């Protein structure tokens, strides 16, 4: 017996029963296949390769070559706002089965079509610029961004100028900004590459006019201009004076400027330029007040070493504008009682000692920190170790003043020549001074206060490097050792210190013209063995020690209002550190910002 086959139900009424998911009928099915979009694209790509259901032929013309691509309008429109507008906005191409793309490389279009169907693109570095240009033309933002990211990661001194000009021409703002940042940060390296010499005088002028250039010394900017002119002296000499006007001439070291006037072949043929520089050099030589010179790049306050229970090897930098502390490359060995200064953009630390439970060694070392590389270099040591040494800079030389070695307190002074990497003794002071304040002003070195092992001083001596002689000037109103001294606007400021009985919070100011000291506003906290520096026409005082212990507080003095303000705290309280101001480290070596931590009391 053969049973008849049931007819397969195809309509609702063909079903003998209806299954309800829930008694109330409120249930629903929510199901997602994560792989569906990629599978759908994969199927579309297979249809394209088999030329099935394609509704458009792209005729791509480049020079004398025409290449055809059969595609689906829907896929192009979904991947490119350019094609979406073409096929949906009543343009003639909306109903066309053929469209011509002119003056675009077929290989590049092929890569972009592949991306539209596969969401993947692979491009050799020689083709990235072509793909970027075409992706921007057809508004394929993901591809353009991928190309920009690739170029940003592969910027080098040899290619950055070309990429920067290309990005500017095609309107790729993010890439252009990044290349300008790279050029500013690596200016000295970029100016050694061939692309640099292809700049027009207007482009070079625009570049060196930026205060955001990161250079250790303004001589790097001057040399770049000289090299650019020398590349084609016959046609470029006419632009030299305009370029010099963009160089911060007053920031050039006098010794460097003197050598240029004596031996630069470009200057010897440019009388107006030579006269211009000669006038400025004579102003420097006569110690005339010079106009303020803006700094290149952001400046930070650097704090090296110091003491808290033991000598420290830390190097930190403080950005007063952002109220941020940066931890940088550690010193070569722990050190406190050191001096610090900046010469040609480099941070130098001089002398000090390494004091701990296991060690107490005075140091004669000279170390140099380069903010462009975050690296330390060891240089020629002092002729004698100097703890609690004073340091100053005059005419491209570093002076190490006084200090102590074991039980000996020094009245001797040494001068360091960075060109020969040698220390030599100069005329000694009239008395030994440990913990004196030292500052350079008007081409002279002032040494203020200090301690000779028996006496604390209020006396002040001034050193004339031209005659290698010392002379006394008006003494302070207060005996001070462990004080901080800075020069600002032709005044010396003596801040804090120790008078033999207690730490001081008072400050007095020396009028160099009138040879008198006058009291000024006092700090909020008493302190000695603190750090002090001038930052953007204000005095910053950091750390130190008083009867309450090691200080972490930072205070700022405004001479216009004669007021001290508490600013922030250092990550760790300390005394006896070296403090100086120079350019911020390059972005590639900056660590992440660290949270401030409370000082242990």
From Swiss-Prot:
Span of domain BTB: 44-117
Reported regulation of activity: Ubiquitin ligase activity of the BCR(KEAP1) complex is inhibited by oxidative stress and electrophile metabolites such as sulforaphane. Electrophile metabolites react with reactive cysteine residues in keap1 and trigger non-enzymatic covalent modifications of these cysteine residues, leading to inactivate the ubiquitin ligase activity of the BCR(KEAP1) complex.
Cytoplasm is among the record's keywords: yes
CDD domains (UniProt xref): BACK_KLHL19_KEAP1, BTB_POZ_KLHL19_KEAP1
Keyword Repeat: yes
Tissue expression from the record: Widely expressed.
UniProt subcellular location: Cytoplasm; Nucleus
GO CC annotations on file: Cul3-RING ubiquitin ligase complex; cytoplasm; inclusion body; nucleus
PTM summary: Non-enzymatic covalent modifications of reactive cysteines by electrophile metabolites inactivate the BCR(KEAP1) complex.
Residue ranges annotated for the BACK domain, each copy included: 153-253
Principal cellular location given in the protein's record: cytoplasm
SMART domains assigned: BACK (SM00875), BTB (SM00225), Kelch (SM00612)
Residue spans of the Kelch repeats: 292-337, 338-388, 389-435, 436-482, 484-529, 530-576
UniProt keywords, alphabetically: Cytoplasm, Kelch repeat, Nucleus, Repeat, Ubl conjugation pathway
PROSITE patterns: BTB
Metabolic or biological pathway, per its Swiss-Prot or TrEMBL entry: Protein modification; protein ubiquitination
UniProt site positions, description: Sensor for electrophilic agents: 127, 264
GO biological process: cellular response to oxidative stress; cellular response to prostaglandin stimulus; cellular response to xenobiotic stimulus; larval feeding behavior; proteasome-mediated ubiquitin-dependent protein catabolic process; protein ubiquitination; regulation of autophagy; ubiquitin-dependent protein catabolic process
Domains: entry comment: Keap1 contains reactive cysteine residues that act as sensors for endogenously produced and exogenously encountered small molecules, which react with sulfhydryl groups and modify the cysteine sensors, leading to impair ability of the BCR(KEAP1) complex to ubiquitinate target proteins.
Family: Belongs to the KEAP1 family.
Subunit structure: Homodimer and heterodimer; heterodimerizes with keap1b. Component of the BCR(KEAP1) E3 ubiquitin ligase complex, at least composed of 2 molecules of cul3, 2 molecules of keap1 (keap1a and/or keap1b), and rbx1. Interacts with nfe2l2/nrf2; the interaction is direct.
Protein name (database record): Kelch-like ECH-associated protein 1A
Organism per entry: Danio rerio (Zebrafish)
């Amino acid at each position: 017996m053969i049973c008849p086959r049931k007819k397969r139900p195809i309509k609702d009424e063909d079903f003998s029963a209806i299954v309800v998911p829930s008694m109330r009928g409120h249930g629903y099915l929510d199901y997602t296949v994560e792989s569906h979009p990629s599978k759908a694209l994969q199927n579309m790509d297979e249809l394209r390769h088999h030329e099935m259901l394609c509704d458009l032929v792209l005729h791509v013309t480049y020079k004398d070559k025409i290449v055809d691509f059969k595609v689906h309008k829907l896929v192009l429109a979904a991947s490119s706002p350019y094609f979406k507008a073409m096929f949906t906005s009543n343009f003639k191409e909306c109903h066309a089965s053929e469209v011509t793309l002119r003056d675009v490389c077929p290989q590049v279009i092929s890569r972009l079509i592949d991306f539209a169907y596969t969401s993947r693109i692979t491009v050799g570095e020689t083709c990235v610029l072509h793909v970027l240009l075409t992706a921007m033309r057809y508004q394929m933002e993901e591809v353009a961004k991928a190309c920009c990211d690739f170029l940003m990661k592969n910027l080098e001194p040899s290619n950055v100028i070309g990429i920067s000009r290309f990005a500017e021409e095609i309107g790729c703002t993010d890439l252009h900004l990044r290349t300008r940042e790279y050029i500013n940060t690596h200016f000295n390296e970029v100016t050694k590459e061939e692309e640099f010499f292809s700049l027009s005088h207007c482009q070079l002028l625009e570049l060196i006019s930026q205060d955001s250039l990161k250079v250790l010394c303004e001589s790097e900017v001057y040399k770049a201009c000289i090299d650019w002119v020398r590349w084609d002296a016959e046609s470029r000499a006419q632009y030299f004076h305009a370029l010099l006007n963009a160089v911060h001439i007053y920031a050039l070291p006098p010794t460097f400027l003197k050598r240029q006037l004596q031996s630069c072949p470009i200057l010897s043929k440019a009388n107006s330029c030579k006269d211009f520089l000669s006038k400025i050099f004579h102003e420097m030589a006569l110690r005339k007040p010079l106009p303020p010179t803006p700094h290149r790049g952001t400046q930070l306050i650097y704090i090296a070493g110091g003491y808290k229970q033991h000598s420290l090897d830390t190097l930190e930098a403080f950005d007063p504008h952002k109220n941020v502390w940066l931890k940088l490359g550690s010193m070569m060995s722990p050190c406190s009682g050191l001096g610090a200064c900046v010469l040609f953009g480099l941070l130098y630390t001089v002398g000090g000692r390494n004091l701990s439970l296991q060690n107490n060694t005075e140091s004669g070392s000279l170390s140099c920190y380069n903010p462009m590389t975050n690296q330390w270099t060891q240089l020629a040591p002092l002729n004698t170790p100097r703890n609690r040494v004073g340091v100053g800079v005059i005419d491209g030389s570093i002076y190490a003043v006084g200090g102590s070695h074991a039980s000996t307190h020094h009245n001797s002074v040494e001068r360091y020549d960075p060109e020969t990497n040698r220390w030599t003794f100069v005329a000694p002071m009239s008395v030994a001074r440990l913990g004196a304040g030292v500052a350079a002003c008007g081409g002279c070195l002032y040494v203020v206060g200090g301690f000779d092992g028996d006496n604390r001083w209020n006396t002040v001596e001034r050193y004339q490097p031209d005659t290698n002689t010392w002379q006394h000037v008006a003494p302070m109103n207060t005996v001070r050792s462990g004080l901080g001294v800075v020069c600002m606007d032709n005044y010396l400021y003596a801040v804090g210190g120790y008078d033999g009985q207690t730490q001081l919070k008072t400050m007095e100011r020396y009028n160099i013209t009138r040879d008198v000291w006058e009291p000024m506003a006092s700090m909020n906290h008493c302190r000695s063995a603190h750090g002090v520096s001038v930052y953007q026409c204000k005095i910053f005082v950091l750390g130190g020690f008083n009867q309450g212990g090691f200080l972490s507080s930072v205070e700022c003095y405004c001479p216009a209002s004669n007021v001290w303000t508490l600013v922030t705290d250092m990550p760790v309280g300390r005394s006896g550190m070296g403090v100086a101001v120079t350019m911020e480290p390059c972005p590639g070596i900056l660590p992440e910002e660290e949270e401030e931590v409370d000082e242990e009391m």
